[in-house]
């Protein structure tokens, strides 16, 4: 499907493929209303947090586009800081798409979770709900929507750094990873895995840490395998965790600091990890764990061309790194291909074009006239913005500041991934509850440590 000479056509075809299951029957107003209220929670026991069918504790983000104006019904509570940031990012991306493309009227629902919420086995009547989300798997119904990383004022300055990072041959010849010990085990609350949905290729279920199956601890496996070849890796947690005992915390790294390493590692967390697009923009060789989770652009990625695949249990990490060191020409080819991929398909205008194709395709499936939801309010973007970055401020220093989660003239969603290093939270002004839970984040905002 991937044809770098026609990226817009490729992305349009990709959007159509995702919407194909609903092409014949379409989508009714009743289905949209039901999806909004009943498909926001996880229903996979083997991945934690299973909610019985017919019940729900949450609702999805409801989006109405009417006459070129954007309305929404929030899906976050007062204490849901991370979800609030994701919601703002999604709305900002849709707003940016409306600024460039004329879009039809739609009424849709979108999940902000890092795992899909509609298992195929749970929908047996042939009319699955159409839920947009960050992530999809072979076992779920989901239409992939760009992750919060692609919020326009966050992604644009990162993307503009393409081609401006150090050459591969002058970088540290090691593989870097920083992050937390987030895992599906956090959702299981200490229970062992009861299924095979996301636990392929792992070690024995008896090999546990913190009472949780090793099959669900991708990041613990990474730490253990990296410890087998310390001369090839610079891998560490930014915070100690019960599931990763024995591995002390290490200093987080900004994206600029990640770009000093030749090899960049990507692994799962609580589910899907939205860090891959950041790594693809850094000009290094990306090593990606085989994963059941997919993002919107993953079908266009080719193993051994754009990324180096790692076994699901990460047992091939050290051997893969040794081979890359021994074949610098192949490593350079891989790094260049990853950069070309990002240029072709992840440019801000391409992301916006993909969103436009999704919305237009979805509109043709609607078997009803979209109307404004009674609880919906208009979103103009002011609640997200601090100030718009200028060309003069979009420098390496700006990238460094944005990546470390500090205020730098960008929207608060800039702190979502803290430069791919999980270095902490960032609280909006006057958010007292956030400051109480994350006092260090508020100290950063005030310019103190």
Where in this protein do the model-derived segments appear?
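Secretory-pathway glycan-assembly enzymes, especially type II membrane glycosyltransferases
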Residues: 1-247, 252-253, 409-412, 424-428, ...
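Long, low-complexity intrinsically disordered regions of secretory-pathway proteins
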Residues: 197-204, 398-408, 448-449
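General helical structural elements
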Residues: 223, 392, 441-449
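Catalytic binding pocket for nucleotide-activated donors in carbohydrate/polymer assembly enzymes
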Residues: 252-385, 389-391, 405, 409-439, ...
């Amino acid at each position: 499907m991937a044809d770098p000479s026609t990226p817009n056509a490729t992305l349009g075809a990709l959007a159509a493929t995702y919407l194909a299951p609903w092409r014949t029957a379409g989508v009714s107003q009743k289905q949209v209303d039901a999806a909004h209220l009943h498909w926001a929670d996880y229903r996979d026991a083997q991945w934690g947090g299973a909610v019985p069918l017919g019940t729900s504790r949450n609702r999805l983000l409801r989006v109405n586009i009417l006459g070129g104006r954007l309305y929404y019904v929030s899906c976050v509570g007062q204490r849901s800081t991370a979800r609030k940031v994701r919601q703002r990012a999604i709305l900002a991306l849709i707003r940016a798409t409306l600024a460039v493309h004329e879009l039809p009227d739609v009424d849709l629902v979108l999940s902000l979770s890092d795992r899909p919420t509609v298992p195929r086995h749970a929908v047996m009547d042939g009319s699955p709900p159409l839920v947009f989300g960050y992530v999809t798997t072979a076992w779920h119904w989901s239409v992939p929507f760009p992750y919060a990383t692609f919020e326009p004022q966050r992604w644009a300055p990162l993307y503009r750094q393409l081609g401006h990072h150090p050459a591969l041959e002058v970088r540290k010849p090691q593989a870097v990873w920083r992050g937390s010990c987030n895992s599906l085990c956090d959702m299981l609350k200490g229970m062992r895995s009861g299924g095979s949905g996301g636990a392929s290729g792992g070690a024995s279920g008896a090999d546990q840490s913190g009472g949780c199956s090793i099959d669900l601890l991708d990041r613990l496996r990474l730490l253990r395998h990296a410890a087998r070849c310390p001369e090839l890796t610079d891998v560490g947690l930014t915070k100690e965790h019960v599931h990763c005992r024995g591995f002390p915390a290490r200093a987080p790294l900004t994206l600029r600091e990640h770009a000093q390493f030749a090899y960049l590692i990507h692994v799962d967390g609580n589910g899907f990890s939205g860090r891959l697009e950041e790594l693809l923009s850094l000009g290094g060789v990306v090593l990606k764990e085989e994963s059941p989770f997919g993002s919107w652009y993953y079908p266009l990625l080719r193993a051994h061309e754009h990324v180096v695949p790692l076994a699901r249990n990460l047992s091939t990490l050290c051997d893969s790194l040794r081979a890359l060191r021994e074949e610098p020409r192949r490593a350079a080819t891989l790094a260049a291909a990853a950069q070309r991929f990002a240029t072709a398909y992840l440019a801000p205008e391409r992301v916006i074009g993909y969103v436009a194709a999704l919305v237009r395709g979805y509109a043709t499936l609607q078997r009803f006239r979209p109307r404004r939801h009674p609880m919906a309010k208009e979103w103009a973007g002011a609640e997200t913005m601090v100030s718009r970055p200028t060309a003069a401020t979009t420098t390496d220093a700006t990238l460094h500041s944005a990546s470390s989660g500090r205020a730098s003239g960008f929207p608060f969603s800039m702190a979502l991934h803290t430069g791919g290093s999980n270095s902490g939270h960032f609280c909006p002004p006057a958010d007292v509850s956030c400051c109480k839970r994350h006092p260090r984040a508020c100290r950063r905002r005030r310019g103190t440590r």
